[in-house]
From Swiss-Prot:
Compartment(s) of residence: Cytoplasm
Binding site for UMP: G44, D66, T114, H115, P116, G117, H118, T119, T120
Entry protein name: Uridylate kinase
Disulfide bonds: none
Alphabetized UniProt keyword annotations: ATP-binding, Cytoplasm, Kinase, Nucleotide-binding, Pyrimidine biosynthesis, Transferase
Highest taxon, organism lineage: Archaea
GO biological process terms, semicolon-separated: 'de novo' CTP biosynthetic process; UDP biosynthetic process
Pathway: Pyrimidine metabolism; CTP biosynthesis via de novo pathway; UDP from UMP (UMPK route): step 1/1
Sites where the protein binds ATP: G9, S10, G45, R49, T140, N141, Y146, D149
Native species: Thermococcus sibiricus (strain DSM 12597 / MM 739)
Amino acid sequence: MRIVFDIGGSVLVPDEPDVKFIEEIAYQLTKISEDHEVAVVVGGGRVAREYIQAAKSFTPNETFKDYIGIHITRANAMLLIAALREKAYPFVVSDFRKAWEVMQLKKIPIMGGTHPGHTTDAVAALLAEYLQADLLVVITNVDGVYDSDPKKNPNAKKLDRISTEKLVEIAMQSESKAGGSGVVDALAAKFIQRGEIKTLIIGKDDARTLFDAIKGKHKGTLVEP
């Protein structure tokens, strides 16, 4: 299979870099890459949102704030590159064609953000579409898709399997400005729907056994066209 992994920045760097988890995810990705083609997109997470929030004190320019977030995603991506050692391409990849070329070298391309207005979820969905990936795996700090925000509604119900259309409907409720933090943002959900991309959305616990998760052993949400 050809698989794109979308790893949330808050998963890798909750308050500070989670070195143990980064080592675990690097091991899992290395193991998976032995039998599958792998590409990775890394998000900015809480750190990016804090910088973007601080920048609001100085500028209303959303594009400028997006660039701040992009730089932080790439710093997080470099951490994962370091953990993957020789298995990863040694530089952060910034375009899809380069990601494809790196995969032909049997290396794992690691991307961060690319363009203002696109979250890393959207980048991952577009990369999956470009590469004609068999599966997009979204690793977030929530263990799947819920019918409402589980942080605000204790009775929120997790959805084990949904359509891409339903994902778009749920994602439309999330924040679309720089630093938005929905499980999957609306633009990414629309790209997933357009590309008819089979998508698995899982939390940090499932990510620790990522090799099993891609085989169906997970507690997350499977999104299908």
